[in-house]
Amino acid sequence: MFMRVISTGSTKGNCYALQSSTGEIVLLDCGCKYKKILRGIDYQISNVSGVLLSHEHGDHTEAVHEIMNAGITVYTGQETIKNLGITDGTIKAVAEKKYFKIGSFSAVPFSLPHTSANKEPCPNFGYLVEHEEMGKLLYLTDFEHCRYKFKSMELNHLVIGCNYCEELIDRNNPKWKHQITGHCSLSTCKQFIKENLTESLKTITLVHLSGDASDAKKMLKEIKEVVGDDVLVQIGRDGLEVDLKLFPF
């Protein structure tokens, strides 16, 4: 069981593949070129059980129509479907805080605060994903903060958007307010991890770093200081594979 980072970042788009030992794949977002997704899953498109879509923005949805044309089911919120202008096809609305099955995986969506460039609220889901081979993985991206606490659930893996460092924000950039109200800062990321850290946590993958307001070395160092040596902390990069096995065999 592993996760492969197919694409990550504010400009390159975001897509991550969870793959079980049987070859079954679930995609987290599909925000890059369809051909890149195909390469990222070794062209095993028939093994994809579905896509968990967080929100409507292009860096998370670029390939959604091609994914649907391939007969793959996309799961997301009803508002996101409406805002994407999709009226038919292999897309299903899922309800917040309600478990559903996606192949041998299960998932439950929860709302996260996000904004669009026009400063309007943007419906956005994070997902708690479970599989017998990996335990519990939490995926959350493009959020200013998260009001939910997951400590009692004893997460095993965390894939979290760590977009920017406060001191690197360019307030002369007209989009700077969207960046801080629609994305997670390093300090917020650290606080979330502190609040939800247990001995069960095995891996943290930091994703969706800003191209001009992030410092990967600083982020890696400070997150490692929070969790210690028993948790594998990595910066997501295209092609990275993260071992998600719950057991060492």
Question: Residue locations for each model-derived region?
Answer:
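Conserved catalytic scaffold of divalent metal-dependent phosphoesterases
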Residues: 98, 104-114, 131-135, 143-145, ...
